[in-house]
């Protein structure tokens, strides 16, 4: 159990309590005032606004935000203010994929070399202070100082939690996954359903096998650079030493941000990495992108509902554990990206929706054995948007029962007032608006109703806590 640092105790009077927030992220809305009105009409109260920085080489110290036009952020902040909506400003970083050395990696793998780490923090500090000044000027309700920087924010390493490094270094394990995927793709093509299974990686590779081999090479090189590829004990020691530097860097940066912006500050950890962030006590809330697996492939409707309840309960317990600083100090939790596609099976691996995958499947499993797998071709999958409605309803039910008292807010990924976004963005949820191209559908309306219900529950919970704290 961690205790808050003394400097943060001194700042407590300056930082407002993280508010309940129920909202989402839009998809290139052309009319922000109409978008804000639509959001309010759906019973939601928060807009998530994003700013972007660019990371050059994954192992370098160059972080730049010169391509981020401040006016693009400001116009969204002003529209939300006009509508009386709450605002969460999120700093995101994208990895420059035009650089060959970054191929097959993502921003969660950003990991500057030891001799570049100080430069990285100096550059990222400028980005964070730029965002903090905007947050202060526009009275943003919550400022998210970074998002999904897995390798840069893993500062604690339980003995059993060295993955993904071990996985990338294990040629036998990566080959097994590769063979499963290639076999799945071959089966799809053999039955005549694989028109989308060509032009791998923009045509750079002739086959999925070649693409996956190249990806394994890149990720193994990344893991070798990060860990030194020594023994487990050597890797553990190396990661812990690096983690100490990262922890100090983030705490100093957060202190600097607080000198500019006096509202609540959090960070957006990935759903599979939040437990490795060791500096939650320096922040005002735990933030997480919420793509947690909730079900298994092939479950009946009854099995699926039971699995959703059990999975959300486990997620709530784990997040609450990370948010617990001491017996009387539990940080609020925000689900910064909460969403599923409209396809059947979207709650098995919410991040998976393209080409082919092999998904964990319902079945009898002996102790110690792996869950059976099923080949899934996403382009052949039928739509089942009610599945995501049920997933959100299960979360709302858990909150209603008192099973996730730490939850303070969520942002749906992604909302739109334009029905044509349904074709290009599988996560899209259509928000009814007074525009001619709007065609509300029952499943999106039902999902928004559950979102509004969850938002109301979170506001009621926050009110109860305020009354209790005044006694």
Which residues does each predicted region cover?
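The substrate-binding groove and active-site-proximal loops of carbohydrate-active enzymes
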Residues: 24-26, 57-70, 109-125, 149, ...
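Short, well-ordered coil/turn segments that N-cap beta-strands
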Residues: 18-23, 43-45, 81-87, 139-141, ...
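Boundary/entry segment of secreted carbohydrate-active catalytic domains
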Residues: 15-44, 50
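Substrate-binding cleft and catalytic face of glycoside hydrolase catalytic domains
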Residues: 42-60, 72-214, 220-227, 231, ...
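Hydrophobic h-region of N-terminal signal peptides that target proteins for export
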Residues: 8-16
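Glycoside hydrolase catalytic-domain groove-lining segments
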Residues: 70, 75-76, 90, 227-255, ...
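Short, acidic/polar
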Residues: 27-41, 121-134, 270-277, 389-399
């Amino acid at each position: 159990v961690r205790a808050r640092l003394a400097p943060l105790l001194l700042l407590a009077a300056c930082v407002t309590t993280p508010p309940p927030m129920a909202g989402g992220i839009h998809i290139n809305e052309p009319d922000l005032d109409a978008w804000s009105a639509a959001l309010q009409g759906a019973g939601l109260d928060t807009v998530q606004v994003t700013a972007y920085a660019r990371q050059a080489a994954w192992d370098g110290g160059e972080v730049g935000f010169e391509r981020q036009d401040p006016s693009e952020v400001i116009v969204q902040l002003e529209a939300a203010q006009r509508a009386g909506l709450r605002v969460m400003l999120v700093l995101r970083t994208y990895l420059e994929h035009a650089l060959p050395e970054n191929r097959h990696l993502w921003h969660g793998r950003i990991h500057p070399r030891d001799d570049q780490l100080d430069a990285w923090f100096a550059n990222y500090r400028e980005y964070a202070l730029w965002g903090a000044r905007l947050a202060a000027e526009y009275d943003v309700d919550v400022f998210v100082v970074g998002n999904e920087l897995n390798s840069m924010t893993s500062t604690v390493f339980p003995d059993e939690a060295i993955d993904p490094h071990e996985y990338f270094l294990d040629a036998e394990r990566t080959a097994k996954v590769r063979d499963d995927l290639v076999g799945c793709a071959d089966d799809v093509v053999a039955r005549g359903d694989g028109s989308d299974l060509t032009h791998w990686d923009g045509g750079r590779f002739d086959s999925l096998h070649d693409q996956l081999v190249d990806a394994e090479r890149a990720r193994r090189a990344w893991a070798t650079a990060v860990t030194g590829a020594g023994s487990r004990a050597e890797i553990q020691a190396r990661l812990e030493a690096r983690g100490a530097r990262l922890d100090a860097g983030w705490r100093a940066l957060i202190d600097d941000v607080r000198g500019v912006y006096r509202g609540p500050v959090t960070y957006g950890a990935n759903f599979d990495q939040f437990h490795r962030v060791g500096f939650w006590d320096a922040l005002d809330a735990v933030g997480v992108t919420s793509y947690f697996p909730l079900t298994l492939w092939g479950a009946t409707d009854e099995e699926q509902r039971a699995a959703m309840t059990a999975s959300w309960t486990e997620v709530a317990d784990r997040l609450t554990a990370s948010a617990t600083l001491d017996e009387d100090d539990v940080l609020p939790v925000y689900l910064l990206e909460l969403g599923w596609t409209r396809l059947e099976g979207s709650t098995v691996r919410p991040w998976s929706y393209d080409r082919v995958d092999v998904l964990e499947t319902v079945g009898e499993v002996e102790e110690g054995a792996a869950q059976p797998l099923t080949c899934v071709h996403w382009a052949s999958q039928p739509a089942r948007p009610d599945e995501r409605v049920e997933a959100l309803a299960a979360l709302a039910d858990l909150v209603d029962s008192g099973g996730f008292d730490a939850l303070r807010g969520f942002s749906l990924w992604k909302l739109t007032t334009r029905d044509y976004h349904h074709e290009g963005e599988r996560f899209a949820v259509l928000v009814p608006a007074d525009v001619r191209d709007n065609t509300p559908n029952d499943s999106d309306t039902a999902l928004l109703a559950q979102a509004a219900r969850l938002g109301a529950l979170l506001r009621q919970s926050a009110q109860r806590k305020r009354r209790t704290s005044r006694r």
